[in-house]
Amino acid sequence: MNKKKAGAAFIVLLTCALAGQALAQGPEFKSNADDLAKIRSMLEEFRQDIIHKDGYAITKLMLNPNVLFHHTNTQEEIDSARKYNAQFDGIGPSQLDGFAKLLATSKDKLEEKFRNIEIRQDGPLGLVTFNYDFVINDKVHHSGLEVWQLCKIDGQWKILSVAWTIY
């Protein structure tokens, strides 16, 4: 009889633990396969625009020309910039125009390779993170972590910000 009570108590405790875990996870993201596929397609479009050196096409992926598009500066870079501008915040103006111009004018073979891609989406908000290698003439020039924020507006996904590390 004690074995039956112990077994029943175990099942009750296990059920409570599983129910508690499910409740602790919070609400599910409002995500769907179609939006995730469209976001993944944007990544490939971005990559192909670099290969084809189409800076204009990259700017069309952005929500507007003023999006944050910048690498994160090291503390040494920030300290150096603050010698000339005490208010330097570590980011500075967007580098989107400069990147688009680089693509349009470079004679080098360019490519950005992505790996460890993670895409999260909750309704009209998307987040993409990945490791990247920026390749010039078939040699890795620099690598890092890249983070995109996206929003869905008028039925289309657009990039709100792109930030990355460089090493």
Residue ranges of predicted features:
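A mature extracytoplasmic/lumenal domain signature
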Residues: M62-P65, N73-T74, E118, F130-F134, ...
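Bacterial N-terminal signal peptides that target proteins for export
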Residues: M1-F10
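Short, solvent-exposed secondary-structure junction/capping segments
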Residues: Q48, K60-D79
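Surface-exposed, charged secondary-structure patches
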Residues: R82-N137
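Sec/Tat-exported extracytoplasmic proteins
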Residues: L43-D54, M62-N66, A100-L103, K107, ...
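Short, low-complexity N-terminal intrinsically disordered segments enriched in polar/charged residues
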Residues: A22-L61
